[in-house]
A protein has these predicted regions:
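N-terminal [4Fe-4S]-dependent radical SAM core
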Residues: 61-77, 85, 115-119, 282-325, ...
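Local cysteine-cluster metal-coordination motifs and their immediate loop/turn environment
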Residues: 321-339
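Conserved AdoMet/S-adenosylmethionine-binding subsite of the radical SAM
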Residues: 76-255
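Short Fe-S-cluster ligation motifs
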Residues: 338-341, 345-379
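Intrinsic-disorder-associated, low-complexity terminal segments enriched in Asp/Asn/His/Tyr and depleted
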Residues: 4, 15, 42, 46-47, ...
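Catalytic cores of enzyme domains
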Residues: 220-325
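Cysteine-centered motifs
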Residues: 26, 36-38, 51, 62
């Protein structure tokens, strides 16, 4: 039996995670992913830590045992890596119709996984988006699936989110329309990430969070929030914003005020991958890919565990992401999934909605391996 490895990487206090096979290559790019060159010849029988020094940085790699040849749990994430509903909805519906998708391994671009999208094995889909309008007229095509949306709607202007349509005229009505179509229990509002600078102050956030809450409160059950993590690429891309690192006191104040606003408008708040304890404000830790929500919506228990490849504070269950980094055209300065906006534009130019890959085509050097998958339903 062989195993795959989850590398937990801490760089100057920042947690980064990447799933990898036995061999990995260590170059200091891209920022949210660490590529390693250490070749591990033995089979892991337990978890252990190793230290690696490369390019002047010290890495702590926590290696966890997990079965490589086991069946993958079939919760689909669409996608933490890009905005599929906004830019790739036609491609998505083609993939659902053909009941499979191809996804390149971000650690080895010539290694491609073939993933079944059959309703018989897919136990749930989480859609991540800032604008679901391209999907709204085709929601009936999702009827065979258990799904919900993570819908990010912030109070930032175009200096931060340059390619998001008008919040008042487009995005808020889209949120309301989506909720009316599928139910407010399937539409999670995300106000995420929060950061402060000279323009986006405590008072600014609280003022406009209230405005948004007044328009969205009856269309959702909860709002998930988080504070900005300054990874290397986000620190670089947000330099023009002159972000001021928030203090714990500021975190506590804004969460207390947000919690009160949420109560006034009939929803609750939780936090995404934040270590801070906010229980005194009735704010819990979120499970953005949520076993309990899928069980409630699908009326069936699921045998699926917490995702070991996410940060310790993350409460998400294990899932398979069908997106690709550097393919989102939203252009949000705080985004961790686009290392280069120009690269994202180039990649989208070779998108083919009929291709099984999100962008590009299968080449002669590519190796396609079918993932072993099975439903994790217990009903």
């Amino acid at each position: 039996m062989s195993y795959d490895i989850s590398f937990q990487v801490r760089v100057h206090g920042t947690d980064l995670y990447v799933p990898a096979w036995f061999s990995a290559r260590c170059t200091h790019a891209p920022p949210r992913t660490l590529w390693c060159t250490c070749f591990l010849k033995h089979i892991l029988t337990h978890n252990f830590e190793v230290c690696v020094t490369a390019f002047g940085f010290h890495y702590l790699l926590c290696l966890e045992r997990s079965e490589r040849n086991g069946h993958k749990k079939m919760i689909i994430s669409a996608s933490r890596r890009t905005d599929i509903p906004t830019y790739y909805s036609e491609w998505l519906f083609n993939r659902l119709k053909e009941e499979y998708v191809l996804v390149r391994n971000p650690m080895n671009i010539h290694q491609i996984g073939q993933i079944s999208l059959s309703p018989d094995v897919v136990d749930g889909i989480v859609f991540w988006t800032k604008n679901p309008l391209p999907m709204l007229h085709r929601l009936s095509e999702l009827d065979k699936y258990n799904y919900y949306f993570q819908f990010t709607l912030n109070a930032y202007d175009r200096d931060v989110e340059p390619n998001i349509p008008s919040k008042n005229n487009v995005i808020i009505p889209a949120f309301q329309q989506l909720s009316k179509a599928i139910g407010k229990d399937r539409v999670i509002w995300r106000y995420d990430p929060i950061f402060f600078n000279e323009r986006y102050t405590m008072e600014y956030h609280c003022k406009y969070f209230r405005v948004l809450a007044s328009k969205l409160g009856e269309y959702t059950e909860k709002c998930t929030v988080s504070f900005l993590d300054l990874y290397r690429n986000t620190a670089r891309n947000t330099q023009p914003l002159k972000i001021q690192q928030e203090t714990k006191e500021q975190q506590l104040e804004i969460m207390q005020r947000f919690s009160q606003i949420a109560k006034e408008y009939g929803f609750y708040i939780d936090t995404c991958a934040e270590a801070i304890d906010l229980e005194k404000f009735s704010i819990a830790h979120a499970h953005c890919i949520d076993k309990e929500r899928f069980e409630r919506l699908g009326k069936c228990k699921l045998a699926v565990e917490k995702d070991p490849n996410q940060r310790p504070e993350c409460g998400c269950i294990a899932s398979t992401d069908i997106g690709t980094y550097n393919t989102c055209r939203n252009g949000c300065l705080y985004c961790y999934a686009n290392y280069s906006h120009n690269t994202a534009i180039r990649n989208t130019q070779i998108h083919n909605p009929t291709s099984p890959l999100l962008f590009g085509e299968v080449g002669p050097d590519d190796i396609i391996k079918e993932r072993k998958v099975k439903s994790c339903k217990e009903c």
